[in-house]
């Protein structure tokens, strides 16, 4: 069945795909019969640049940077000119999915890893809990599958769940072989933690900094691989696509070098999107904050930078600034005619640190919420309201070990009923040494603000955390766009269903990054790089002609618009929803976008202009609208999507929401790819 869903300024074509008992029908994604009706594209959005600004100096280096060799820049063999580069594989994103994939395909060709910030600055690096995998004799794949499907409110694709749970242990062993160091027990075996929704201890972890350790190991391997070239501070603008009969084909990506303000065109045989989620459509998120400061970089004499040989060692200081999780991959894929699925399922982590409850209030508002890992509750942490009344047993028999959607809604209900701003998570009844061993990062962060978690409860509040929806992928990470693969949070593989089970995200990224390798290699064997392809599309330009004063005005207005959008999403598209509130959000977002776009063009913005903040804003608008429209299409409450107008689970609606690409009706600049699709 198909339903045409009206949006604020157009329509999207939705289709529900029935799969029965958590299993979707087996099909090749590229064989979808796409709806090409004349309907407006939801991705209408716009934005403004973030360059030519004075940023404060921040020269501190992360442990990953200190322990890694300088990342390789591109050699002339990959260049056509300074602004066009050719690779066998282009990887957008430097988290666990992107790096793991890059290391495998690098055995078969050259790889460009394109990342918008520092290479380590990804959601992976912020992941605390761990990776779930069946490594204990008392556990089983069937147990892990059952826990995943129950947490996903029976919307999971059973075939995907089985594949991921079965292949997980091997992916862990590969990480260990690559040098990742995980916690071990006194018996010498891996220490396996337990988290909410899991029936067994199966979480492999490195204290409460698991993602950081995995990222370190992967980055070190990437540095040592001669076929992988890292392009840091390169922001992906739009995918380069062509139409070949009924097929859309991906040929690479345009990216903005935010250090030099040049647009670089990457032409590749295969492109992997591993760009993460869209947490910054909300004002409070656990996703990485904005990276702002001054970058100092020394280039060795023997390297080529932007196609020019540096005769002497050069010190460059450049302004930088970007958010990480702004939905870039999802929005780019949507504009490129990729299928999007299950965007209504936004996971709010139930326990982010509530600054208002700390003994010492932070001097400034955080750019992101500090995550208190699921493992705290898994280790026996108890949730209380401010009267120290335990409340979770009133909501679910699993109490604190219930899945995230249940715990987040329960906390939200307590806060609204009691008119309070946070609840308390107490682990102080556990031995001090155990707390400090398992949660050193959390203990240190809380102690910065006068809170000793070995004696005091932690103030916590829900925050946007993870997108269960994304670009629809098959079992090998393939999409309906030829040459385009996806892995990690940007993808919707069917694993998570309506709610992600704790510590299944890194697992999914590892499994699908690995599964996408062979079809990618096969695709490169059957395709050639056309060295005239770079001329198929017009090149975006940087708006230097507007001048620094005008750009400053545009940037300030864009930041205001970003906050307005985030406020609308939190107020009307949060943990508990209603049809009226969703419709209000749809209308207000559409109006906000149109007003902002009009402002841009009044200031002299041109259709071909791009900037970091501009592209982030257009992508945030795109993802916000996808979430709202998907939520309006689901007339039931399931998993992370809870609406008071349809409070019950409806068996007949246990179907994934799929947003098919529409025929482009490009009545505004922001509703289309910056480059017109090449016709072949």
Question: Which stretches of residues belong to each language-model region?
Answer:
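Extreme N-terminal leader/targeting segments of oxidoreductases
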Residues: 2-89, 107-108
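N-terminal Rossmann-like FAD-binding beta1-loop-alpha1 element of flavoenzymes
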Residues: 88-113
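Glycine-rich loop(s) and the adjacent beta-strand/alpha-helix scaffold that form part
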Residues: 270-297, 311-370, 401-402, 502-515
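Conserved redox-cofactor binding core of oxidoreductases
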Residues: 174-262, 267, 353-354, 362, ...
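Glycine-rich FAD pyrophosphate-binding loop
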Residues: 106-128
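Glycine- and aromatic-enriched mobile tails/lids
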Residues: 2-6, 78, 85-87, 118-120, ...
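An anion/pyrophosphate-binding glycine-rich loop and adjacent beta-alpha core
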Residues: 332, 338-458, 510, 519-526
């Amino acid at each position: 069945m198909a339903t045409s869903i009206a949006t604020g300024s157009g329509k999207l074509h939705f289709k529900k795909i029935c799969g029965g008992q958590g299993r979707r029908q087996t099909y090749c994604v590229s064989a979808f019969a796409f709806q090409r009706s004349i309907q407006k594209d939801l991705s209408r959005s716009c934005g403004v640049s973030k360059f030519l600004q004075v940023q404060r100096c921040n020269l501190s280096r992360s442990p990953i940077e200190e322990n890694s060799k300088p990342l390789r820049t591109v050699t002339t063999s990959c260049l056509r000119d300074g602004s066009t580069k050719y690779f066998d594989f282009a990887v957008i994103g430097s988290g666990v999915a992107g790096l793991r994939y890059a290391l495998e395909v690098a055995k078969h060709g050259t790889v460009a890893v394109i990342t918008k910030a520092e290479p380590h600055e990804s959601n992976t690096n912020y992941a605390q809990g761990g990776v779930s995998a069946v490594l204990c004799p008392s556990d089983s794949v069937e147990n892990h599958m059952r826990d995943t499907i129950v947490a996903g409110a029976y919307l999971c694709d059973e075939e995907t769940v089985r594949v991921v749970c079965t292949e997980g242990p091997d992916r862990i062993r590969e990480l260990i072989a690559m040098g990742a160091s995980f916690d071990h027990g006194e018996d010498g075996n891996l220490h396996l933690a337990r988290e909410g929704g899991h029936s067994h201890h199966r979480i492999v972890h490195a204290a409460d900094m698991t993602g950081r350790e995995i990222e370190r190991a992967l980055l070190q391997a990437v540095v040592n691989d001669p076929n992988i070239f890292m392009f840091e501070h390169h922001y992906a603008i739009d995918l380069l696509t062509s139409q070949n009969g009924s097929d859309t084909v991906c040929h690479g990506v345009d990216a903005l070098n935010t250090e030099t303000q040049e647009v670089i065109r990457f032409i590749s045989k295969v492109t992997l999107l591993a760009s993460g989620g869209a947490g910054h459509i909300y004002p409070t998120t656990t996703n990485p904050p904005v990276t702002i400061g001054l970058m100092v970089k020394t280039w060795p004499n023997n390297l080529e930078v932007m196609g020019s040989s540096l005769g002497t060692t050069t010190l460059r200081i450049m302004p930088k600034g970007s958010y990480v999780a702004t939905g870039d991959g999802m929005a780019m894929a949507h504009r490129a005619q990729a299928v999007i699925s299950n965007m209504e399922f936004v996971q709010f982590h139930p326990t982010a640190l509530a600054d208002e409850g700390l003994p010492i209030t932070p001097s400034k508002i955080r750019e992101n919420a500090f995550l208190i890992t699921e493992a705290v509750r898994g280790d026996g942490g108890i949730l209380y309201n401010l009267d120290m009344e335990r409340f979770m047993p009133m909501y679910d028999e699993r109490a604190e070990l219930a899945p995230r959607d249940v715990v987040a809604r329960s906390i939200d209900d307590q806060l609204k009923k009691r008119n309070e701003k946070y609840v308390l998570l107490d682990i102080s009844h556990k031995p001090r040494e155990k707390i400090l061993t398992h949660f050193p990062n959390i203990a240190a962060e809380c102690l910065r603000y006068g809170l000793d978690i070995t004696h005091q409860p932690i103030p916590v509040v829900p925050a946007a955390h993870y997108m269960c929806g994304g670009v629809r992928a098959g079992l090998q990470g393939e999409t309906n766009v030829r040459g385009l693969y996806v892995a990690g949070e940007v993808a919707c593989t069917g694993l998570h269903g309506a709610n992600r089970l704790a510590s299944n995200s890194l697992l999914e990224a590892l499994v699908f990054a690995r599964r996408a390798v062979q079809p990618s290699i096969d695709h490169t064997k059957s395709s050639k790089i056309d060295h005239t392809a770079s001329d198929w599309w017009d090149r975006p330009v940087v708006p230097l002609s507007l001048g620094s004063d005008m750009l400053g005005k545009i940037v300030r207005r864009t930041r205001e618009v970003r906050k307005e959008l985030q406020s609308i999403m939190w107020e009307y598209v949060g943990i508990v929803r209603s049809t009226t509130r969703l419709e209000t959000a749809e209308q207000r977002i559409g109006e906000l976008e149109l007003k902002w776009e009009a402002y841009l063009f009044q200031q002299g913005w041109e259709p071909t202009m791009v900037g970091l903040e501009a592209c982030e804003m257009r992508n945030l608008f795109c993802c916000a609208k996808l979430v709202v429209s998907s939520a309006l299409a689901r007339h039931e409450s399931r998993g992370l999507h809870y609406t008071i107008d349809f409070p019950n689970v409806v068996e007949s609606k246990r179907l994934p929401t799929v947003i098919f690409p529409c025929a482009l009706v490009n009545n505004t600049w922001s509703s289309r790819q910056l480059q017109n699709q090449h016709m072949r």
